[in-house]
Every structure is written in C-alpha cells, then in structure tokens.
Amino acid sequence: MIIVTGGAGFIGSHIVEYLVQRGDDVTVLDNLNTGKMQNLSKVSNNVNFINGNISEYKLLEGLVSDSDGVFHEAALVSVPQSFEMQDEYFDVNVNGTENILKLAKEYGFKVVCASSSSVYGNPKQIPIKESDNRNPINPYAQTKLKAELLAEKYSQNDVHVIGLRYFNVFGRRQSKEYAGVIKLFLERIQQNKAPKINGDGLQTRDFVYVEDVVKANILAMDSNVKHQFFNVG
C-alpha cells in the first residue's frame, strides 16, 4: 500500500492518479484545508480517502504501519500566510514531517518528501545546485528547511528518505492563489487581455510542469538512491 499525504491537493492528486493507473493500492490522507475532493474525481472509486492531518500521530501510525512507501506532499504553502500563522506552519510543516519520519524509522517504509526551492532564499548564482547554501528568507521557507534538516537527521538512522525541492510547479488543477502566475497569464490571454506583470518585468522564475514533478516522485520512490535531496525544476 502507498500513502499520499496531501493527496487531494494540486501535486498530490496528480501523483495519486498515476499510482492508481499503475495499479497500486493507494490511501490518501488530506484534511481538505486546501485540497479538494474534485481533484480526485477520476480515481475516487479506486482510493481509500482519510480526512485527517499529519499532526495526528496515532492516525498516521494506523495508516502507515503496513505501508510500502509514503509520498509526503501535505503542507501549508502560502508565503504571505506563513507570516501570520507561524505556529500553525511549524506544527504542520515541521512537526507533521517529523511524525512521518519517526514512523518510517519504526516501520521501515520509504519516504519521498516534498521540499521547496525556497530553502535557497535569494541565490547568488544561477542555475541553483543542490549543494548551494540554504538561506530561507520567510517563515514558510524556514519550515521547509527545518523539515529537510529533520530528514537528514533521520537518514543517519537508516530512514530511507529522498527530498525533492520543487521550483514553481504549474499545470491542471493549479490554484489561482499566490504563485499561480502561468494560470493567471493564460486566463487573461483567453480573455483577450495582456498578462499582468508586476514590477519591471526583468524578474525570472523557474517553472516545472506538474506531470514532470510526478515523474520525479515516482523515480525517487522506485530508485535505490537513499538520503539525498534533488532539485525539480
């Protein structure tokens, strides 16, 4: 059985669809804070859905004790909101991740953990390499770095964990909220309006298609690689 935390979210739901199409037995854990059941409409009859939070240790333990692997996508992800809800972001993104790592140590399953390019902060050089310094500049990014440090700590105790640092992911079912710039651009173009660009237009961002993010997750889970972080962009 494969567990996908945050499996009703943008990226998680695409991972779930791939796993179901491959024939895997899939359980989704999502509290539907930002995830939506409609994201799972194509596969809802083929997954076991649990409405819950990764901060609920006993609930997690009951799910993962017989698991072959966990795709850990659940997180609070809004940078602006993270300034206002720092305790909540720490509880979910850090404590919730540690719950999964503790259980991975006890039960021996593999974890593919979603991280973020935001851990690098404002990079001094492009392209960014995995070995570059991590210098997060907002509370959200700080929680992702703390989660990475926990993963590194647990990997020293033979927990099989791979971290994927997503850059700006776009694709079907993407929210129009913060950072969904491609979706916003396309909507304005469809309305015969010019894309709205903030600032001087010289800023750059690295984008990655959601299906490519799915491929990265599957390769990470199926590989024999252990205890590494990879950029996905």
Regions found by a protein language model. Give the residues of each.
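N-terminal Rossmann-like NAD(P)+-binding domain of SDR-like oxidoreductases, especially those catalyzing
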Residues: M1-V169, I189, E211, N224
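Short donor-sugar binding/catalytic loops of nucleotide-sugar-dependent glycosyltransferases
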Residues: L32, G201-T204
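Secondary-structure boundary/capping motif
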Residues: L59, Q81, R173-E177, R205
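Conserved catalytic core of two-component sensor histidine kinases, primarily the HATPase_c ATP-binding
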Residues: Y57, V79, A194, Q203-T204
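Short alpha-helical segment that forms part of, or immediately flanks, the ligand-binding pocket
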Residues: D87, L186, R205
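Glycine/proline-rich active-site loop of Rossmann-fold NAD(P)-dependent oxidoreductases
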Residues: L145, H160, V169-L184, K193, ...
